Amino acid sequence: MEKKPYYITTAIAYTSGKPHIGNTYEIVLTDAIARYRRAQGYDVFFQTGTDEHGQKIEEKAKEQGITPKAFVDGVASTVRETFDMMNTSYDYFIRTTDEGHEKQVQKIFRKLYEQGDIYKGTYEGLYCTPCESFWTESQLVDGCCPDCGRPVKKAKEEAYFFRMSKYADRLMKHIEDHPEFIQPESRKNEMVNNFLKPGLQDLCVSRTSF
């Protein structure tokens, strides 16, 4: 009898610094689910990895006098060693600087652009470099990032956007038809009430100046 496929992934660890307890907590939980599904007879593919792009990485590398690639090589190695030390059973460890990953991203990006789902526009917002987060004026606390309290800077540039608004109705219907699609319930409510019902916004998918 052919096994039913089951794909599971962690979020990919950001490589601006050493792995932390949140990374290990997540990989252990995901590993437990993967092992449970294998025991149930599923053909499990368990993926994890590292996110190796961002302004914070560039700044950390500059502080150490090395290239961003050399910096993320060291952090990615530490992340993988940590996951291996915990005997997690992942099948594939992806790095966003891997040549294969870059080629696949470019292929998907071109396909989406050709079919009109990605377009060029202008992105403008208030950006916190340490948190790598954008905020609106109303979200700031005394003019600073609400998470870390540091100053933010205005950022405006040409960027590419994914036409997410095009799929709002389809997403809402899928969630209504498959109530278990987003779990736990609190996260489903957050997605529906905070994003879909107010009007799903197009997503910026590129950066050029930061």
Where are these regions (language model features)?
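Structured secondary-structure scaffolds
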Residues: 1-48, 100-104, 157-210
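The substrate-binding groove and active-site-proximal loops of carbohydrate-active enzymes
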Residues: 15-21, 59-68, 89-100, 181
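N-terminal cofactor/phosphate-binding cores enriched in small/glycine residues
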Residues: 19-78, 84
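Short low-complexity, flexible loop/linker segments enriched in glycine and/or proline
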Residues: 59-63, 107-108, 135-138
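Short, polar/flexible loop-turn hinges at active-site or ligand-entry regions and domain interfaces
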Residues: 64-70, 115-121, 135, 178-182
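A broadly conserved sequence feature marking short terminus-proximal activation segments
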Residues: 71-127
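Cys/His-rich short segments
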Residues: 115-172
